[in-house]
Amino acid sequence: NMTPEYYANLYRRYQTYVRHYQDSAPIQKICGGPNAGDDNWTKKVLETCFASPAPEDAHGFMDGLSMHYYTVPGESWMNKGSATEFTTDGWYQALGKALHMDDLIKKHGAILDQYDPEKKIGLMVDEWGNWHEVEPGTNPGFLYQQNTMRDALVAAVTLNIFNKHCDRVKMACIAQLINVLQSVILTEGEKMILTPTYHIFHMYKYHQDAELLRSDLTGVDTIQNGEFSIPALQESVSVQKDGTITVTLANLSAEQSYP
């Protein structure tokens, strides 16, 4: 229930006491940023953190600004929809909302550019992923949900978006690793499985430590589903130091395959 100005002043105060313990592993100071599209929070927090007497080289006393955005495929927060029982409309609703991540990064990134044109401050998307209704019969407080190819595609398009904004997005954490929301691993007693989302992360690992290559797709079909206009294909491309090029191409169509 804080105003952004009040929070930012508290942040400025307490970050003063957080010092590096060793130069080889400097502490990264992450300021609490916006939830989804709350650009007023971003504006006011940055305005306050950069206000005099902040030194110019302190870049707002932060190394990163956090951002949360969950894909809620259902009609509302109170009706999120099932993770496994969904229609074609539900497929496209999830992907359309996942693609909104691109708009959010551009919106908050543009505000950051006003204060930090050199992009020293990372946008830290520290909570993202699908948020469905909990699996029937499980403790609702544990947020346990199943995982399908729809979740895999949401992960794929989101990681492609992060790749394309790697000059500003410096960290991104799916929520969460095991047994909660869009997990990469599900367990029950001594048993465990790797989810479709896990396999997306495994396939995308070749982008790590690589350099982004500019890429665009032409002649791609657009799928119109209600309020969402969704490209049938979406991609990101990188090149490793040895010249190996990695292309991750996501097919968003629920019905059409592409050669």
Give each language-model segment a name:
Residues 4-158, 217-229:
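Noncatalytic carbohydrate-binding groove/subsite architecture in carbohydrate-active enzymes
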Residues 69, 120-238, 242:
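Aromatic/acidic polysaccharide-binding cleft in carbohydrate-active enzymes
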Residues 92-95, 188, 192, 248:
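Generic amphipathic alpha-helical segments used as scaffolds and interaction surfaces in large
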Residues 75, 182, 257:
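Glycine/Thr-rich phosphate-binding loops of Rossmann-like dinucleotide-binding domains
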Residues 253-259:
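Surface-exposed beta-strand/loop patches in extracellular or lumenal glycoproteins
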